[in-house]
Structure formats: structure tokens, C-alpha cells
Amino acid sequence: MHYDVVIIGAGMSGLAAGIRLAYYNKRVCIVEKHYRVGGLNSFYSLGKHRFDVGLHAMTNYVPKGVKSAPLPKLLRQLKLTVDDFALCPQRMSVIKFPDKALRFNNGFDFFVQEIADNFPRQADNFQKLLRTISEYDELNLYTKPISARQVVSSIISDPLLVDMIFCPLMFYGNAQEGDMEFGQFVIMFKSIFKEGLARPEAGVRHILDVLVKKYKSCGGELKVRCAVTGLKCTNGRVVSISLENGETLTADRILSSAGYVETMKLLANHDSSKLNYQAGQLSFVEFILILNKEPAEMGYNTAITFYNNSDRFDYRKPDKLVDVSSGVICCPNNFQFENPLPEGIIRITNMANFDFWNKLS
């Protein structure tokens, strides 16, 4: 079977790419090895409970009617509206360290005041950081990468405040140990602090349902339980993919959202010794707790807590199975839903060592 475009992986990026291509009359096929779409952001059922995995909340939330922010722009590209995702904003989140706590909601002025109240000597420096962020072109792909730690620490002189600012940005949008590229820092700072967090009442499955429905309505084809076993190259470009069921698909263009390392391993003439790549070092483990009452009834009203219990925030691969000294605690119940969720849920995410987990019998 021949297509204009074949996309490997039905995660959010694969589905979004498929929508764009199919909308403009390309014959598109997305192949997904699992029986559910979503990739790292998916869902499953166990007993009578429904669980989301991956996505805690959507960043870049802005009130309806704002048109110039990234999320409305993205939705327009996908021919969707804000109402399609049925997003409900957070109530309040917090960055909690041993000696300080900084609250934030979807009103940026509130966060600015929290900085001034908790770090009065850094108030002017924080304003300087805001000017630096607003003047930086984070979308310029030709900008030379620079250390975000270096830039921020040259402006904010209190290491504690530096760590507290970095904590949520790293957990929600950084694949680099210890530091992050300043352009990525700017993107995450704007998306979490200047814009905000929200989620649909039905969780990630609602977002995925919307994307799949839109993709199919544009004429896109979706094959699930359809693992790719190999990529065939001719004259330096991939021309076809082999599927686990024995089928071969050809296409003018083949896109992969499976990850660089995973994609390279699919090449028919793959030789890892000749390919210069490094697998990511960061992994996470999640604990999901089901409660018999609303968390607010127990005095817990926070949507998301980004915490660190150590003297310094050390964002890196731990030397043990799980590092519980820092992490993210998400309570889906504490978003501004019209109706209460069926049950209380607490999701705890911590950094983990994949190598140690992979060796467990």
C-alpha cells in the first residue's frame, strides 16, 4: 500500500502531524504498535478505575478569547477550538522547598507578588529576569544554545529562588540533567507561569479522542496493534516500512515520532557502533493513589505540588531505583471542574533509574 505520508507513532505529535497533512489532502497513514493511541500520554482501566498516565495537566492555558498565545495558535493550526478540549483551569499550585513555598495560579501577577513577598531582596532582579525573558526569541532555531542556569544565576543572586523557579520547568519540560537550554527555559517559564495549567474533566483520553476524531474526519487512516519491524532505505532515504503482520507500506515521506534511538534501530542495516547517538538519561516512575473521598475534604486543595526536600534541587538520574527527595504531586480533583470527579486521585511522579528497574526480575 502506498501513501503520501506514513507516520510512525500515534502519540500527540504523530496525531497532530497527521491532522495537518490529512487536512491538506495528503493520503496519510499513522501506524501504532499499541492498541491505544497516546504514546507517553495515555490511559488504561484497572478494575473499576480509570487511570491517566503521562500528562498531569496541559500547559499554556489562557482564557477563552485570547488569540495570540501559543495554545490558541496551535488549535487553529489543527482546525480545533478551545471548547473542543473542554479545559478547566487549576485552582492553585505550589513549589515547596524545606524553607520556602511559592504559590502560583493562572494569574501571573499573583506569582510575581509571591516572589516579592518571599524574596523581597530579589524582587528587582526578578523583574530584570522577566525583561530578559520577554526580549529573548525562543523560537529562533539558529540561536546558539546557552545555559539557562548560567543566565538565570547571573540575574537572580539567591540560589534558593533559582532552584525553585527551575523545579517545575524541569519536571514538565526538560530532558537534560542539571541544566536546560535557555530557549527551552523561556518556553516553559511562559507556558507554566505566565500562562497556566488546565485539564479536561475526562483527562487525557478526552484530548486523544478529539485528536483521533479530527484526524479521521480529515481522511487520515490509523492502524493500531501494528508494530513497525524495519525501515528500508534506498539512496540514503527511507522508502518503506515493514510491519509485524508482514505488510509493507511505501510512502513519499515517512515521519517517525518513535524517538531517535528507537527509529535508528529500525533501519535494516542498523549498526549501533557506527551511529553517534546517546539514549536519554532521565526516567520517571509514577504512583497513583485512589482515595475514598475528595482530597479537599482532607484539607488538600493544591492542584500540583512541585517539591524538593534537599538543600539544593538536583535534577538528574538517581543512583537508586527511585529518588523521592524531589518530585511532582498532582491532584486532578483540584481543578475547577463543574462536577466532582468520581473518586479522589493523587498522582506522585519521581525520578527513577531505568537501568536498575530494567535489571529487576
Residues of each region from the PLM?
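Glycine-rich phosphate/pyrophosphate-binding beta-alpha loops
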Residues: 55-61, 169-174, 284-286
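Mid-domain catalytic core of redox enzymes
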Residues: 229-340
